[in-house]
Regions:
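Short, charge-rich amphipathic alpha-helices with coiled-coil/heptad character
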Residues: 1-20
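Extended alpha-helical coiled-coil "stalk/arm" regions
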Residues: 28-57
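Long amphipathic alpha-helical coiled-coil segments
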Residues: 34, 69-98
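Short, glycine/alanine-rich amphipathic alpha-helical segment
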Residues: 48-73
Length: 99
């Protein structure tokens, strides 16, 4: 894992672009998986007693596991992108002697 605190502002901006690209692609895959989940729910809703049981059953599928993994990665990326944004702001203010 890279230490973002040692990156220059241009390196941080480039890293942020790469993360944003990954975030976008993961979001596209998430949409596909959510559509699959809707089809799964439609197919198996009558065979389970509750929505929670249906959700647990979905989470045991490969696609359900992938969706959970993507959700966790997206949340992590949101925090990292926010940290990079803050770090860029601090570095820019330091460059202007405003800190």
């Amino acid at each position: 894992m890279e230490d973002i605190t040692k990156m220059t502002p241009s390196e941080l901006a480039n890293h942020r672009l790469q993360l944003a690209n990954f975030y976008s692609k993961a979001g596209e895959r998430k949409v596909q998986l959510m559509k699959l989940r809707a089809l799964y729910y439609e197919s198996f809703r009558e065979s389970v007693k509750s929505d929670a049981a249906l959700e647990r059953k979905w989470e045991l599928t490969n696609e359900g596991l992938e969706l959970m993994e993507i959700n966790m990665k997206l949340k992590s990326l949101e925090h990292k992108l926010s940290a990079i944004r803050t770090l860029l702001e601090v570095k820019n203010n330091e460059a202007r002697n405003q800190y």
